[in-house]
């Protein structure tokens, strides 16, 4: 049974159309939040919103390309007009890329930067503007790639390192405004994002690579989106009111136990 930890709160989740973002939306909806589901894929975002509503929650989809600052500003204005003043924000939207510094083209780097770095920056600007004077909780999705070297993930690692430092900066600059800003660093998590990534990067070898990735986790398996959502709920709820400027790993021991 839900404790309704987010009752009366308005929350926005970017990349809410699938995977971790969808799991966060579904759990936040169960906990009483009024949800704005943002996704560049309008159909996927609406599907998530419909699932939240079917479970008795309140949710609306707002199609949004987080890399476009003007679009982000318009969407944040619209969602607050529809749902109320913003209390919680989860910056989850992101893309992956395979490559070393030599094999990553400038176009590849620009594409990853636009979504994973500029996209978070764009959202953070609108979020802190909305929360100043009333407080709130912001959660950024970083990665184990923020902390350790991972083969063939140059652009992705760069982008997630930037997410982590943006988290620390926002936490420092806005703590006096009652705004908490934290990050979580997932390890390997089984999502449609991962399945699609494996199909594109390793055609014909998806099953082999899935098992290989799962074995990199000391705990012996990939994480599930619902496990990430549970940590997100804690950090965005009043249970975490004394936590800000933190990066919490949720990686099956990938960073601290890897040998």
Regions inferred by a protein language model and the residue ranges of each:
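Substrate-binding pocket helix/loop in short-chain dehydrogenase/reductase
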Residues: 100-101, 105-111, 213
């Amino acid at each position: 049974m839900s404790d309704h930890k987010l009752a009366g709160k308005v929350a926005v989740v970017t990349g809410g159309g699938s995977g971790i973002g969808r799991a966060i939306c579904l759990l936040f909806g169960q906990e009483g939040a009024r949800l704005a589901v943002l996704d560049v894929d309008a159909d996927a975002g609406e599907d998530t919103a419909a699932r939240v509503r079917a479970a008795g929650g309140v949710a609306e989809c707002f199609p949004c390309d987080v890399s476009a600052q003007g679009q982000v500003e318009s969407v944040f204005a619209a969602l607050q007009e529809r749902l109320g003043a913003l209390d919680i924000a989860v910056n989850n939207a992101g893309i992956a890329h395979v490559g070393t510094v030599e094999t990553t083209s400038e176009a590849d780097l620009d594409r990853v930067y636009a979504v994973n770095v500029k996209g978070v920056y764009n959202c953070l600007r609108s979020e802190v503007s909305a929360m100043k004077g009333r407080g709130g909780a912001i959660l950024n999705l970083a990665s184990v790639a923020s902390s350790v070297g991972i083969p063939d993930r140059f652009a992705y690692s760069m982008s997630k390192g930037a997410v982590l430092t943006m988290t620390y900066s926002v936490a420092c600059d806005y703590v006096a405004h009652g705004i908490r800003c934290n990050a979580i660093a997932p390890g390997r998590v089984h999502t449609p994002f991962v399945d699609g990534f494996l199909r594109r990067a390793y055609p014909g070898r998806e099953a082999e690579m899935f098992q290989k990735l799962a074995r990199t986790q000391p705990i012996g398996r990939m994480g599930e989106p619902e496990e990430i959502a549970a940590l997100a709920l804690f950090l965005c709820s009043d249970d975490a009111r004394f936590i800000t400027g933190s990066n919490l790993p949720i990686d099956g021991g990938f960073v601290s136990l890897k040998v």
